[in-house]
């Protein structure tokens, strides 16, 4: 048992049973250890560190209720600051940090192993800290927590509550474990992973973005609806609501029965997936004076690339001659494809617009 009575004391620990007692206000004190060590409750130590920062022996360090700087070594450290607002520093190795105070800060240099921050509360990684994984300590917990990455690429994992996850600059992988999660995208390489049935989830983006296959996200939207920067948004096989901004957006629902909103600007709505009853999209704000519908001739067979010819379009419930291919029902808003006009093929609906738009072939472009 080592006791200081004031002054800037240094304690050397080489036995797991060693105990350091330091009263509050007793100087700036440090503990240097060559083995796993946890500070005693009530001992106001300012620095807990390994004796050899370049050593590769795995050493685990725990603080106490006071604020400490805790420094590992080049091995795989487990560092837990406990209650205080701690600064935790790794010197290489695959380190794990436990965060339980909003003021905790993790410092990790580039190339310092594969490092993980595990938190029991909302947490934002410090700029310049190259941590590879940021995760909530209890994935099945339902407490709402917000997680922010930094300029590096991270995997960020939420819990079963309503999380707000923002990867920031790097190409991040963001994972929700249930709850109504919100994901913020600012890198085209960001990936959102959401299992089916995991709540009502939103992806808000400042860049053009395509949802990953298999990610059951309900809403994909431009983060700033009034912005005029052109952003392209693409859904996946699930049904989504997709909302653009005031710029010229290219919006593609992918498969699934999607609800598409351009939100102003000269928008293009893309249809390039197999037609069917489960793949009928609704366009909520189509403006024939500025928006276009882009149809893929690999799906809409027989149409020539470029502007749709007037002969291939008909406004009516059914084709009226053999050249009609794209049909707009002015009464219901249904938009359909008929592969042979008045021949024997049945028309297939692929979208629903507002009724009464008085559309013409000029609203369509074949790609």
Task: Kindly label every feature range from the protein language model.
Residues 53, 139, 197, 225, ...:
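Short polar/acidic secondary-structure junctions
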Residues 55-57, 141-143, 228-229:
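Short glycine-/Asp-/Thr-/Trp-enriched loop segments that recur within the blades
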Residues 266-367:
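Acidic glycine/aspartate-rich repeat arrays in secreted/surface proteins
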